[in-house]
Amino acid sequence: MSTNNSVLVLKVGGALLQCEMGMARLMDTAAAMIANGQQVLMVHGGGCLVDEQLAANGMETVKLEGLRVTPPEQMPIIAGALAGTSNKILQGAATKAGIVSIGMSLADGNTVSAKIKDERLGLVGEVSPKDATYLKFILSQGWMPICSSIAMMDDGQMLNVNADQAATVLAKLVGGKLVLLSDVSGVLDGKGQLIPSLNGKQIADLVKQGVIEKGMKVKVEAALEVAQWMGQAVQVASWRDASQLVALAKGEAVGTQIQP
């Protein structure tokens, strides 16, 4: 990949944390990109670890329209699982691949503004871009920020933010190219076949038909929002697929392109 000024924002799902080989492969790809002058910013979820920790503490996981409901009593556990354990597992994999990384959250460096998204969801946040100084400094050093989706309101209250939405906001903030990586190769049609490209109308139709639902609906809508805001396609792809990672490292299109 040729050196360019655009930041590649990689959003990784929680399932990656349970696949050591997948993490190693992804970090090796990121290391090669960084060595080639590409700035890389990683944003992560950690839903599976959150679910485990909640269950261990006798609490249940509740979701509303694909988004995690976060009661106040669950916030310390969710913050620990995301900003703590998940973040450090990824940082460990990055270190192993020779990447200098900075573990951070949305609360760091005055990076975003946060507010309650919807009272029905509890302490779930909605964030908007605020100040890119901190991120741009880290990236300018050739380091890779690894950002969890825990944000903070002005009164110090922690909020849990959907990681796809967090990645969208950070991509907007740094003017980056967004790739949403999950454990599926992209958006699949009703027959399980990969859809190479989608626009807003096609997405709305597939949501209405129930083909795109729950977590993938949140993911695709976040991708569409950033595609429209930045006037460029956003990719939904898989960290499981080695060929997609190789193509990604070369700057090629992978998975499903969400068109503005």
From Swiss-Prot:
Name-wise, this protein is Acetylglutamate kinase
Cited InterPro entries: AceGlu_kinase-like_sf, AcgluKinase_fam, ArgB, Asp/Glu/Uridylate_kinase
Q: GO molecular function: any one?
A: ATP binding
Which processes are annotated in GO (biological process)? Answer: arginine biosynthetic process via ornithine; L-arginine biosynthetic process
Q: Pfam families from the xrefs?
A: AA_kinase
Write out the catalysed reaction: N-acetyl-L-glutamate + ATP = N-acetyl-L-glutamyl 5-phosphate + ADP
Residues engaged in binding substrate = 46-47, 68, 160
